[in-house]
């Protein structure tokens, strides 16, 4: 009997070790999705999966999921460091009645979304909804037609870095990018480079805890403000913009209020063009501060100039 029990224990240990090894082997560093794939596959290049969600469980933390060919690869929730890359294909997400991508990872995780078209189908919630991560990189993407939320939403309780580059965020019912942290001492650091925000309510809505730097961007044809910096309580919102176009918005090109702080700078030789906005080129609301260099062009707006602004830099 004791020999039988010993044999059973050995078999149980062997089974556990085999299962552990199998799970480890299933977590590949690089996996693949395809429009003709199947999520029962191992997500290898020769046997790809069908969806991001199907591949993510088979991809190790810090790994990468690549799109082999054009396809709609479905909404996905990300809970670890990972890269989704659709570069060179027409990789897309059709997010009807849901968020396109939800990021709820550890506060030490880095997530990269690259080369993906994210379509809200006129009833989606948010294009990318960021709840927690250390850093989120959005590169070479198009995010559009989310009618109950924002193109990119950040609602974070910890510090977070958001880097958006070479991306179009358009035609969303609420904001193109909306950032806020609920932690009084926390901050969201946002870098925008060559980002086009158009056809939203506010192109950029930087709320409490937001620290934004934007360059070579376009904030145009939004129904309210091109850029809106506002905050509540002691946690300020700061936006620094240079070498950008802020035009044809339904209310103001730039608005700062509710303890918001916007620094509109043309740096040394570059300019911001703030023109043809319906109400004001620049509006300083209660509690707001706008610092402006002299090399911004503020013309053709309902109200031009920069009343209430503080001049900084050369020539002031």
Residues of each region from the PLM?
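Extracellular beta-strand solenoids
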Residues: 67, 78, 86, 103-105, ...
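Acidic Gly/Asp/Thr-rich repetitive segments characteristic of extracellular carbohydrate-active
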Residues: 35-74
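Right-handed parallel beta-helix
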Residues: 88, 109-120, 134-146, 159-174, ...
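Extracellular beta-strand/beta-solenoid scaffold signature
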Residues: 95-104, 121-130, 146-156, 171-186, ...
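Sec/Tat signal peptide C-region and signal peptidase I cleavage site
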Residues: 21-26
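Bacterial N-terminal signal peptides that target proteins for export
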Residues: 2-12
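Extracellular beta-strand-rich solenoid/capping regions of secreted or surface-exposed proteins
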Residues: 60, 73-85, 92-135, 148-157
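Bacterial N-terminal signal peptides
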Residues: 10-20
């Amino acid at each position: 009997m004791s020999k039988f029990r010993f044999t059973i224990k050995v078999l149980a240990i062997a089974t556990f070790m085999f299962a552990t090894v199998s799970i480890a082997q299933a977590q590949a560093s690089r996996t693949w999705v395809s429009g003709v794939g199947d999520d029962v596959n191992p997500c290898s290049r020769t046997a790809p999966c069908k969806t991001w969600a199907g591949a993510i469980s088979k991809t190790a933390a810090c790994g990468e999921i690549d799109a082999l060919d054009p396809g709609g690869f479905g909404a996905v929730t990300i809970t670890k460091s990972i890269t989704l890359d659709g570069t060179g294909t027409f990789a897309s997400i059709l997010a009807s009645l849901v968020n396109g991508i939800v990021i709820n990872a550890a506060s030490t995780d880095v997530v990269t979304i690259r080369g993906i078209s994210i379509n809200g189908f006129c009833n989606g919630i948010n294009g990318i909804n960021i709840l927690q991560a250390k850093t989120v990189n959005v590169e070479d993407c198009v995010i559009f037609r989310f009618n109950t939320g924002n193109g990119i939403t950040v609602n974070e309780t910890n510090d977070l870095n958001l880097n958006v580059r070479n991306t179009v965020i358009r035609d969303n019912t609420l904001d193109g990018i909306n950032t806020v942290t609920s932690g009084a001492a926390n901050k969201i650091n946002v870098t925008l480079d060559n980002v086009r925000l158009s056809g939203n309510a506010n192109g950029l809505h930087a709320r409490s805890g937001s620290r934004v730097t934007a360059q070579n961007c376009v904030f145009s044809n939004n129904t309210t403000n091109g850029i809106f910096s506002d905050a509540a309580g002691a946690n300020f919102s700061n936006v620094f913009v240079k070498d950008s176009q802020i035009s044809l918005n339904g209310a103001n090109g730039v608005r700062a209020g509710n303890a918001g702080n916007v620094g509109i700078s043309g740096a040394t030789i570059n300019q911001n063009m703030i023109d043809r906005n319906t109400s004001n080129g620049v509006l300083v609301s209660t509690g707001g501060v706008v610092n402006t260099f002299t090399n911004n062009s503020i013309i053709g707006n309902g109200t031009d100039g920069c009343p209430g602004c503080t001049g900084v830099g050369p020539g002031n």
